[in-house]
Regions:
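Long, charged/polar, soluble alpha-helical segments
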Residues: 20-196
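Bacterial N-terminal signal peptides
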Residues: 9-17
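Bacterial N-terminal signal peptides that target proteins for export
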Residues: 1-8
Length: 196
């Protein structure tokens, strides 16, 4: 009797698993769409292909609701596939444009760093910036826009650090020189007044 109960329980569990397997929620598609969505938002590409982004967001939101409510996995999968395709379109259209803008911005920042001679004062950050710039140019040459954008964002970060570190040191030096000049003038005045 015990054996029959055990086999019946296993059989029911097996039937339940088989019946549910055909209608499982599309978690892989959800993960893929979420990854593409996160990239789009991280790089702030929403406005480069607004229509596609809106389509992606609408489909993604509707699919998320279906998944949360554990309803209609087939429709959720279709919505997530549509969302992923739209997010990919936004990335494909937006990343090259964003990379071009960043390249222009980093050219200005590189010039500022060179003018202030950051390569002498903050050599580490300056060299990291230049290395990332070369990597960005290489990535642009192979149309790897995501890598180019990441490198160009690093260029901005490192050149900014190098520039402001150098500026701070120059400002401190200028202040010290001004104070020294004031002290020298004060001493000269004292010497003149004492020699009379």
């Amino acid at each position: 009797m015990q054996l029959i109960k055990y086999i019946s329980t296993l059989l029911l569990a097996f039937i339940f698993i088989i019946s549910c397997s055909g209608s499982s929620m599309p978690f892989k598609e959800y993960k893929d769409a979420t990854a593409l969505r996160d990239k789009t938002i991280r790089y702030d590409l929403q406005n480069y292909s607004k229509e596609q982004f809106d389509i992606a967001e609408a489909n993604y939101s509707e699919a998320a609701i279906l998944i949360d409510e554990n309803k209609d996995p087939k429709k959720a999968k279709e919505l997530l596939t549509t969302a992923s395709n739209a997010y990919q379109t936004v990335l494909n259209e937006g990343l090259p444009k964003y990379a071009a803008i960043l390249k222009e911005e980093t050219s200005v920042e590189r010039e500022y760093s060179k003018e202030i001679k950051a390569y002498k004062v903050d050599k580490d950050n300056y060299e990291l910036a230049e290395l990332n710039y070369l990597n960005a140019l290489s990535a642009l040459g192979t149309n790897n826009y995501e890598e180019a954008v990441n490198c160009l964002l690093n260029v901005k970060k490192y050149h900014s650090r190098a520039y402001f570190t150098t500026k701070k040191r120059y400002d401190e030096s200028a202040k010290a020189l001004k104070e020294a000049d004031a002290k020298i003038k004060e001493l000269e005045e004292l010497r003149k007044s004492s020699s009379k």
